[in-house]
Curated annotation (Swiss-Prot):
Gene3D superfamilies: YcgL domain. It comes from Xanthomonas campestris pv. campestris (strain B100). Residues 1-83 form the YcgL domain. It comes from the Bacteria. This is YcgL domain-containing protein xcc-b100_4189.
Length: 86
């Protein structure tokens, strides 16, 4: 399976993987309103052996097959001072 990766130009470290190049119609309108415009980054073959930096390739493939897109949000970092240890 092939995926086409785009980065949001509004939200840093947010990426959209599409099953079909430039087919933004599969992304819900409310998501597009928050993240668009998108800039093309790369196309990638999502083979079972493929390792992605922040996403699980099996999860991405499943989302592409069922929804036509996968949304990769930035990782959240919890600082020690922000944790509730009680």
């Amino acid at each position: 399976m092939h995926a086409y990766v785009y980065k949001s130009q509004r939200k840093q470290d947010t990426f959209v993987y599409l099953a079909t190049r430039d087919d933004f119609s599969v992304i819900p309108a409310d998501v597009q309103a928050r993240l668009a415009p998108f800039a093309f980054v790369l196309d990638v073959a999502l083979t079972p052996e493929r390792r992605l930096a922040q996403a699980d390739a099996d999860t991405v493939r499943a989302a592409l097959a069922s929804h036509g897109f996968y949304l990769q949000l930035p990782k959240t970092v919890v600082l020690a001072g922000e944790c509730d240890y009680d």
